[in-house]
Regions:
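Short S/T/G/P-rich N-terminal loop/turn motif that feeds into the first structured element of a domain
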Residues: 1-67, 75-94
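Glycine/threonine-rich phosphate-binding loop and adjacent beta-strand/alpha-helix elements that clamp
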Residues: 70
Length: 94
């Protein structure tokens, strides 16, 4: 399994707006080949996004659409997101 690991710094007080925007994009996100999409609110207007994919190829194929989706958040993010592509060696579901 592979993941896009994205750290985002939001403009002050914009976390709720970002979460609502992501909820409105559920259909678009579902068409990108990912298996899970997770937003973690780390407090202080910081968040981490995890987008999980079965294969590295699925993750790479989603790149252009991912960039387009991130651009929709430009009104709420304070700095360009830091995106890393990582491997997920363990993902237990209970």
């Amino acid at each position: 399994m592979y993941a896009s690991y994205i750290e985002m710094r939001l403009k002050p007080g914009k976390m709720a707006d970002a979460i609502e925007m992501a909820k409105q994009m559920e259909a678009d996100l579902g068409q990108m080949g990912m298996k899970q999409f997770i937003i973690v609110d780390r407090g202080n207007d910081n968040s981490t996004v995890l987008a999980l994919y079965d294969t590295a190829e699925d993750q790479e194929a989603a790149g252009p659409k991912s960039a387009e989706i991130v651009s929709r958040f430009m009104d709420v993010i304070a700095a360009p997101p830091d995106r890393k592509q990582v491997e997920v060696p363990i993902n237990f579901t209970f």
